[in-house]
A protein has these predicted regions:
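One-carbon transfer enzymes
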Residues: 1-191, 240-243, 249, 261, ...
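An anion-binding loop in the catalytic cleft
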Residues: 176-273
Length: 273
């Protein structure tokens, strides 16, 4: 409700420079395949496309089909590699340009670039950095393919990991987990889909930013509020303590945690679930 369908930046640019735009619901559609044959592309570039290309399309261009994938393959094949890199506490991520085959991100690797993941970096921040790095790497790879200077490197199947679709149940914060794990979850799901906890009154509180504090709270129950003052609030975890820096009550905008504490009178000793 209230959401408007908007064209992508790629389509907007293509229309502006009079490039043909094809948007088949199914890439296996015979009419689409015939049009692709008529266009006779030298190379097909794929990015964030949610369908498998049929072999007939993969074999069509003389330089093949290449995919821009936001992970250091063979790690995190699949739909959500950026989320999972942060969720799993990785210290670096990257972009791989790969030659496509009929599998899911299984093709030979052409070129890679890596970036460090800082301890407070969010999924949105990593996405934006990889977007810039990936675009530059794609242009370089196309030049190298044209010059015949790129060497395809097969992936090691024994090192493959997968980044499956993000589901709604992954948004809930389980305070029995460690502070590090919860901090990674919050970073991984910012800005989408977000994480939440349940307040003592039963309402949801989204948590957007956090920080792992030194020390522990072994005598406290997981989810228990240890401090609530002008600086925000600290929560006991299964291991360690997590400081909430930014949150969002139901029906309101995101705010600094200290603003939430000042307005809600959240009390030390209360339990979040």
């Amino acid at each position: 409700r209230g959401h408007k369908l908007m064209m992508s930046a790629v389509k907007e640019y293509a229309l502006a420079v009079n490039l043909p735009v094809l948007q088949p619901e199914r890439v296996k559609d015979p009419a689409f395949m015939e049009e692709m044959k008529r266009l006779s592309p030298d190379l097909i570039v794929v990015a964030a496309f949610g369908q498998f290309l049929p072999k007939a399309l993969l074999d069509l261009p003389p330089f093949g089909c290449i995919n821009v994938h936001a992970s250091l393959l063979p790690a995190y094949r699949g739909a959500a590699p950026i989320h999972y890199a942060i969720l799993k506490g990785e210290k670096k991520a990257g972009v791989t340009i790969m030659q496509m085959d009929t599998g899911m991100d299984t093709g030979a690797m052409l070129e890679k670039v890596s970036v460090p993941i800082g301890p407070e970096m969010t999924q949105g921040e990593l996405h934006d950095e990889l977007k810039e790095k990936g675009a530059a790497l794609l242009l370089q790879t196309i030049d190298d393919l044209s010059a015949g200077t790129v060497t395809a490197e097969p992936q090691e199947e024994t090192k493959a990991t997968y980044a499956s679709l993000i589901t709604r149940d992954m948004e809930h914060l389980d305070w029995t987990l460690s502070a590090d794990t919860l901090h990674n979850q919050i970073r991984a799901f910012n800005p989408w889909p977000g994480t939440y906890t349940i307040l003592p009154d039963g309402k949801r509180l989204k948590v957007w930013k956090s920080h792992v504090l030194p020390g522990s709270a072994e005598q406290a129950q997981p989810g228990q509020i240890l401090e609530a003052d002008s600086k925000g609030f600290h929560i006991a975890c299964g291991t360690g303590v997590l400081a909430v820096l930014e949150c969002q009550p139901e029906g309101k905008r995101a705010m600094a945690a200290q603003s939430f504490v000042n307005g809600q009178q959240i009390a030390v000793g209360e339990i979040l679930s």
